[in-house]
Structure formats: C-alpha cells, structure tokens
C-alpha cells in the first residue's frame, strides 16, 4: 500500500483587530470595554487594604503592569497603549492651579508643594534608572495650558495688542521646534565596528579564560592596566602625558569602542558621544548632536516666559513694576479670572527660575569646556578646581580658554575625531 501523505495543517490566520481591540501582555485578545473586568490583583489589593493587611511588593507591581497594559485609546488596527506617566500632569495640573486660585494661602501651599512633588518623583525614577514621560508631559502641557489661560483670561481685557500676541505665539512655536530638534539623536554610538575590532576572541592561555574584547584582556577584564569596571564607571580617557590626545575606551555593556568624553547612559541603555547629562524634561540624553539645540530651547523658553509673565502682570496689576506686582497686587483675588492668571504667573515664575538655573550651569560648563557628567565625577572624586562653593568646576582637561571653548561648542557635531582601535591596545 502506498503511504498516505499527511496534509499540512494550515495555521489559522489572525483576524484583524478592530479599533477597540488589542493583544494584552498575556498574548490574548482583549477589548477596551473590558478594562475593569478580571482584575484579580486589584481585587486582592483592595481586600488586603480593607482588612488593614500589608500589600506585597509583587502585587503592587502586577497591579501597575495591569493598569498600564489596559490604559489604551481606540486606534486604527487596534487600540494603542498610553504611557501612564503622561496622565498625572494632564489631570492634576489644572486641578492644582484652580484650587490655588481660590485663596492666597491655598496658593502658597499648592505652589510650594508642586516643586517638592516633582523632585520626589524625579528621585524615585532616577533611583530606579527608568525612563519616564512625566516631565516631558508636564513641560509640554504647562506650555499649552499657560497659553490657553493667557488667551482666555488675559487677552480679552484689551491690554495685549496683536503684535504682542503674535510675538508670544512665535516664541511658543520656536520653543516647540527647538524641543523637537533637541529630542532627536543626541549622538548615539552604534556598534558598526568590524568584528576584528569590536569582537576579538582572545586565545586561551594557562590561567586565563576565553574572553571577548581586545587582545590581552584576561579573565578579570583588565584592559591596558584598567578593568572594564573602571571603564563603565568612567575612568579618564585622556593620557596624563598628553592631555590633548584623544583615546578611546571599550564599553562592556554596548560592546563597542567609545571615543573620549562619550559615556554609557544607564537610563537610555546606550552610549552617547560627548554626553553631558540625561535630561528628564526631554526624556533623552544631551550629547554632541543635540547640545546646541538644548541650549537654544532653554534660551527661547526663558525669553518667551519672561515676556508672557510681564504681559500678564501689566494686565492684571496695572501701573506697577514687574517685580513689585509679583509680591504686591491688591485686589487680585477679587475675581476668579485675575486670581487664576496671578496663580499661573507664579507657577511660570517657579518653572522659569528652575530653567534659568539649568541654563546658568550650562553656560558655566560650556565656558570651562566641561560636561555635567565630568563635573559630577570631579565633585565625587574631589578633583579639579572648584569656585563659588562648587558652582564652577574646572577639571583642566579640556579647558582651552573662554573663546576657544565656545568656538568648539559652536562646531559640535560638524566633525568627529576617530582614532583607530589599535592605537589604544
């Protein structure tokens, strides 16, 4: 008898998702309308809370994961997941500002608490080394909401002309354009080296293990009398005998050769060329390719913010100077419109003061040709020259004078110095 050929079982084709359906974290099809169904972890957490029992950490993590997975909006070909960290600013900021405009004392309490809550959340996420869209959402929504209050409460009073409104609108648009440019690639290092340079398998010697890296790297990971741990922690990449000579280091995490002043960002999980710092306000690193756009965004924001604050105070506190109106504006709480505008002014002042401090630090660092990461490393290791209680730190490694430092900053990203890997072995 001839053997019977078995027919190949055809896998069923997946049906296209409608706008409200999605594939959840368990790989099953789910619906947006069922977001409150089958919440075992949430039920368990509520039961333990009602019975005054402690909630286990793993239960809290599962509840957070479930909420973030089910928080979606209808979209074409399936519901899209919404990052839960962008929601609190959209909901809480208008509520807090409206509550603060009810009374002077409420305004003091709320406007004092907001920076503290933001700092608490920053240190919480910074300690976990996690990316968050909270601060980017807070910044963008603050810009939009302040502009909305200005159009609704300040412009109708007739003291803001069309030219002034056009200037403020152009400033807002320029801020968004500069932020868009600053959000782009800060100078990520890609692992495009050849295998002979980036992944060299060392021969096995007696007393050594097979490792990947540069020739001469033993089992302890030493490289040129330094360990890979030192490279990850940020050992100096400038030779003592020739400070101007650029050397390159090996990143054990990205498995690539990084040039001088590059650093591995533990939040982004990738190496950045001439990394300055990881900025939570743009949810990205500030590096060689976007440092100029970052400074431009800060400068435009400060000018636009001060201009908007002055226009608002001249409208609600007439015939008073800008500084006097901030602290003494009689009758500002007499009606709700002026009270809300005055509260938004003080909120803008707090944000502007914080950004002005960041801008000042950036100007000082550029003038001394140091990055923020190099400053923090010098403060920890108690090296370099410190002035004004550590506000100014000069490491002395790359400082070539004020004009040359700014000239080098103005040409960032236009050329890149490459050093062969053989030169550092």
From Swiss-Prot:
Stored InterPro entries: Palmitoyltrfase_DHHC (IPR001594), PFA4/ZDH16/20/ERF2-like (IPR039859)
Entry's localization field: Golgi apparatus membrane; Golgi apparatus, trans-Golgi network membrane
A GO biological-process term: protein localization to plasma membrane
Tissues and organs where the protein is expressed, per its UniProt entry: Expressed in the brain.
Keywords, ordered alphabetically: Acyltransferase, Golgi apparatus, Lipoprotein, Membrane, Palmitate, Transferase, Transmembrane, Transmembrane helix
Domain of life of the source: Eukaryota
EC number: 2.3.1.225
UniProt similarity note: Belongs to the DHHC palmitoyltransferase family.
Record's protein name: Palmitoyltransferase ZDHHC23
Annotated source species: Mus musculus (Mouse)
């Amino acid at each position: 008898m001839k053997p019977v050929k078995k027919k190949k079982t055809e896998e069923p084709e997946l049906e296209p998702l409608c706008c409200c359906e999605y594939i959840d974290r368990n790989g099953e099809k789910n619906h947006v309308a069922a977001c409150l169904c089958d919440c075992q972890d949430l039920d368990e957490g509520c039961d333990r809370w009602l019975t005054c029992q402690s909630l286990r950490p793993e239960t809290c993590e599962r509840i957070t994961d479930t909420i973030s997975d089910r928080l979606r909006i209808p979209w074409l070909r399936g519901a899209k997941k919404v990052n839960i960290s962008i929601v609190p600013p959209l909901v809480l900021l208008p509520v807090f500002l409206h509550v603060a405009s009810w009374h002077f004392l409420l305004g003091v309490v709320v406007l004092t608490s907001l920076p503290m809550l933001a700092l608490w959340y920053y240190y919480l996420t910074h300690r976990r080394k996690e990316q968050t869209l909270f601060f980017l959402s807070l910044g963008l929504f603050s810009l939009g909401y302040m502009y909305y209050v200005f159009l609704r409460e300040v412009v109708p009073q007739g003291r803001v002309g069309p030219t002034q409104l056009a200037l403020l609108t152009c400033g807002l648009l320029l801020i968004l354009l500069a932020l868009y440019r600053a959000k782009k690639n800060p100078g990520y290092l890609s692992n495009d080296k050849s295998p002979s340079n980036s992944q060299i398998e060392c021969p096995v010697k007696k007393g050594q293990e097979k490792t990947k890296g540069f020739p001469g790297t033993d089992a302890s990971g030493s490289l040129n009398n330094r360990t890979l741990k030192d490279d990850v922690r940020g050992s100096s990449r400038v030779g003592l005998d020739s400070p101007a000579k650029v050397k390159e280091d090996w990143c054990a995490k990205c498995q690539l050769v990084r040039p001088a002043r590059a650093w591995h960002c533990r939040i982004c999980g990738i190496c950045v060329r001439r990394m300055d710092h990881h900025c939570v306000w743009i949810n990205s690193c500030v590096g060689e390719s976007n440092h100029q756009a970052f400074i431009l965004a800060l400068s435009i924001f400060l000018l636009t913010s001060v201009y908007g604050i002055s226009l608002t105070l001249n409208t609600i506190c007439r015939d008073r100077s800008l500084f006097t109106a901030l602290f003494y504006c009689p009758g500002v709480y007499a009606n709700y419109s002026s009270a809300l505008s005055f509260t938004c002014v003080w909120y803008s002042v707090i944000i502007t003061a914080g950004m002005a401090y960041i801008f000042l630090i950036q100007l000082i660092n550029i003038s001394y040709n140091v990055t923020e990461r190099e400053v923090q490393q010098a403060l920890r290791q108690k090296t370099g020259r410190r002035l004004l209680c550590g506000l100014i730190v000069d490491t002395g490694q790359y400082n070539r004078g004020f004009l040359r430092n700014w000239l080098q900053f103005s040409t960032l990203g236009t050329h890149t110095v490459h050093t062969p890997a053989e030169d550092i072995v």
